[in-house]
């Protein structure tokens, strides 16, 4: 159900509270997922004119789970705070004295419900952390992370239900990784969606038993960051080592991700240097180039009255990854009606060369390769 459809069914006096939750409500580490409501119902009599819904189920993303809490207002007394039912978490009993925004409920503030929900989620986090005391191993993992502010202040924990047969229970740690994405080139962060939210990397680590014999890590990147780093398949984090612990493993993942970001930033500046060198060496032979991301360059060249194009595609992780050179005849066509072309990656190249050296080496390579390309174009293409 879309936020607009839901809001149209809410009692008008309660609508400002709900609107603030579904339109602006982001709670916890996962900034890519908003709060949402379902199961709208009314406690009013059938004679009450609509819209009159005053109770609903609130879905809250937390530590890779979705909490489903019932929120119950009274449309007849909209100035009163709501009641809460915490679904399956029957052991979760919030401390009322710590719920300042509930105790001092201000119906003139549209965000008062959202503020109460945030306080409840904080208490729910403390409740889940307290459950780890049943396992000395999981408590060790939690306490060692807590001692590091960069991890301890950006962590959510969910302890699963205890197995009645074994007495074991699973637990999931969700951490917001302290990785700086601010220097990623802006062109890579465009066109993902209209409201991408915060740029964030979340590491989820699931312990399937209290002795950490089965541990499953997974990295989640916000849409813009995933796109900027080359897609979901571009980054593979290491398996959790047997006998390892989170305080050693999490920095490894941070280091891996930081290096990946640096590769992208370095690649952008190196591609710009590369294209600047080609503009200098080939001058009017440059037909077009990508002036934003510096990922493509096209040259129009001539060798002994034979004109040809060279399309240069620079990869995201240039100069580590070698550019592709595609030679294209301006005269000859394939059977499918395309200009005859050959792609080359087997040519002299070193990622240690600067842009000027790469341009000089490319010019020398063009002279040696073009004769055989011309011969192949005449042999295999059609005028």
Curated annotation (Swiss-Prot):
GO terms for cellular component: BRCA1-A complex; BRISC complex; cytoplasm; nucleus. The keyword S-adenosyl-L-methionine does not apply. One of its GO terms (molecular function) is polyubiquitin modification-dependent protein binding. Keywords: Acetylation, Apoptosis, Cell cycle, Cell division, Chromatin regulator, Cytoplasm, DNA damage, DNA repair, Mitosis, Nucleus, Phosphoprotein, Repeat, Ubl conjugation pathway. Residues 275-364 are annotated as: UEV-like 2. It is found in: Cytoplasm; Nucleus. Residues 30-147 are annotated as: UEV-like 1. The modification Phosphoserine is found at residue 2. The modification N-acetylmethionine is found at residue 1. GO terms for biological process: apoptotic process; cell division; chromatin organization; double-strand break repair; mitotic G2 DNA damage checkpoint signaling; positive regulation of DNA repair; response to ionizing radiation. The keyword DNA damage applies. Contains 2 ubiquitin-conjugating enzyme family-like (UEV-like) regions. These regions lack the critical Cys residues required for ubiquitination but retain the ability to bind ubiquitin. Component of the ARISC complex, at least composed of UIMC1/RAP80, ABRAXAS1, BRCC3/BRCC36, BABAM2 and BABAM1/NBA1. Component of the BRCA1-A complex, at least composed of BRCA1, BARD1, UIMC1/RAP80, ABRAXAS1, BRCC3/BRCC36, BABAM2 and BABAM1/NBA1. In the BRCA1-A complex, interacts directly with ABRAXAS1, BRCC3/BRCC36 and BABAM1/NBA1. Binds polyubiquitin. Component of the BRISC complex, at least composed of ABRAXAS2, BRCC3/BRCC36, BABAM2 and BABAM1/NBA1. Identified in a complex with SHMT2 and the other subunits of the BRISC complex. Belongs to the BABAM2 family. Component of the BRCA1-A complex, a complex that specifically recognizes 'Lys-63'-linked ubiquitinated histones H2A and H2AX at DNA lesions sites, leading to target the BRCA1-BARD1 heterodimer to sites of DNA damage at double-strand breaks (DSBs). The BRCA1-A complex also possesses deubiquitinase activity that specifically removes 'Lys-63'-linked ubiquitin on histones H2A and H2AX. This is BRISC and BRCA1-A complex member 2. It comes from Chlorocebus aethiops (Green monkey).
């Amino acid at each position: 159900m879309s936020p607009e459809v839901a809001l149209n069914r809410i009692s008008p006096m309660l609508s400002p509270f709900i609107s603030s939750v579904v339109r602006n409500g982001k709670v916890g580490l996962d900034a890519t997922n908003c709060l949402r409501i379902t199961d709208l119902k009314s406690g009013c009599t059938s004679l009450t004119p609509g819209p009159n819904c005053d109770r609903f189920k609130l879905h809250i993303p937390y530590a890779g789970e979705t909490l489903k809490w019932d929120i119950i207002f009274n449309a007849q007394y909209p100035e009163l705070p709501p009641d809460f039912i915490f679904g399956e978490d029957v052991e979760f009993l919030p401390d009322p004295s710590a719920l300042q925004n509930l105790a001092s409920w201000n119906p003139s503030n549209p965000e008062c419900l959202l503020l109460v929900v945030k306080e409840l989620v904080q208490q729910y986090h403390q409740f889940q952390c307290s459950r780890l005391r049943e396992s000395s191993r999981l408590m060790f993992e939690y306490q060692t992370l807590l001692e590091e502010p960069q991890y301890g202040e950006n962590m959510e924990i969910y302890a699963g239900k205890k197995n009645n047969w074994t007495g074991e229970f699973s637990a999931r740690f969700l951490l917001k990784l302290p990785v700086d994405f601010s220097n990623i080139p802006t062109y890579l962060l465009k066109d993902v969606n209209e409201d991408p939210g915060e740029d964030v990397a979340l590491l989820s680590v699931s312990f399937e038993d209290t002795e950490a014999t089965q541990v499953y890590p997974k990295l989640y990147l916000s849409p813009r960051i995933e796109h900027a780093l080359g897609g979901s398949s571009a980054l593979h984090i290491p398996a959790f080592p047997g006998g390892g612990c989170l305080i050693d493993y999490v920095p490894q993942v941070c280091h891996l991700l930081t290096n990946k970001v640096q590769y992208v930033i370095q690649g952008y500046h190196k591609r710009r240097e590369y294209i600047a060198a080609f503009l200098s060496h080939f001058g009017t032979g440059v037909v077009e180039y990508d002036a934003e991301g510096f990922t493509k360059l096209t040259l129009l060249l001539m060798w002994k009255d034979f004109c040809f194009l060279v399309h240069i595609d620079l990869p995201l992780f240039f100069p580590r990854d070698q550019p592709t050179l595609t030679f294209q005849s301006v005269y000859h066509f394939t059977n499918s009606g395309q200009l005859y072309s050959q792609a080359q990656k087997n040519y002299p190249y070193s990622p240690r060369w600067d842009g000027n050296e790469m341009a000089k080496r490319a010019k020398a390579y063009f002279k040696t390769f073009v004769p055989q390309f011309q011969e192949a174009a005449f042999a295999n293409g059609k005028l």
